[in-house]
Amino acid sequence: MTIFKYELKQLRGSIIVWSAALAASIFFMLPVYIEMLSGAAKMSSNFAGNSFFDVIGTNVDILSTPIGAYSFLTIFVLIAGAINGMKLGLGIITKEYMNKTTDFLFTKPHSRSKIFVSKLTAAVSAVIIIGAFYFLASWAGMQNGSDGNYNFLTFALLALSVTLIQMFFLTLGMLVGVIFPHIRTTVAVSAGVAFVSYVFGAFSRKMGNVIIGYFSAYIYFDGAYIIVNNSYKVEYMILLASLMLIFTITAHQIFCKKDVMVAS
């Protein structure tokens, strides 16, 4: 518990900044985009064959609805969430090596397993807090922009996807962190991984290649599919949970066995 509290306290600044940034952005932008895109369906003929919609996985008819506008904005929030999740996972591991505190931490009366679990729990708590603020701000924005004219389940699934994608990249970040503990530029690495993953997803949609889509977590939260079916795609959720479990177990095993190395 001591390690958990310490790690969560260390993440306090990040939690405040990300919660405020995501919540404020979606709250103020959503009503504007709902109004702006409400007439998009009337101009559908002008956008026929536009490859942009294929790349982002939506269409004009969906965009013209309040929930469609929210889905469109969620695409960009997912990218931000992926960067934050990856950065959290990387940072919570690599900071011990960068700050040369590994020898001190690992010689305290705590097992490595407890240290890892405490770090993971603190990072997951941070993601949940950020996700909760985003959810509430999204709900307030939807109420303000659509006058309550939307399906709450669909909205909840779209909003929850921001938390889930952060969880996915958090576990991936921790795995990368235990393998390459001396990474200094965590933000750059996180942004790069998030962007490459998005490119895989965009390429998958454009080419209609399902296999490539499995390499992009963004595909797992396809807004158009969620809006039409009011659910996530089952196989993607199974894959997501499986990968997160594999990343976590592998990272835990490496962390517990890795030699203590102090950064020079």
Where are these regions (language model features)?
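Transmembrane helix-loop junction
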Residues: Y6, K95, W139-Q143, G177-V178, ...
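Long, hydrophobic alpha-helical segments
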Residues: G68-T94, A191
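Transmembrane helix boundary and interhelical loop/hinge segments in multi-pass membrane proteins
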Residues: M86-F106, L120
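Hydrophobic/aromatic residues in alpha-helical transmembrane segments
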Residues: G85-G89, A137, T171-L172, A217, ...
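Secretory targeting signals
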Residues: A23, F27-P31, I67-L73, V117-F169, ...
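Terminal transmembrane helical anchor/hairpin motif
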Residues: I3, L11, F28-I67, I179, ...
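Aromatic- and glycine-rich beta-strand/loop motifs that create alpha-glucan
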Residues: M1-L22
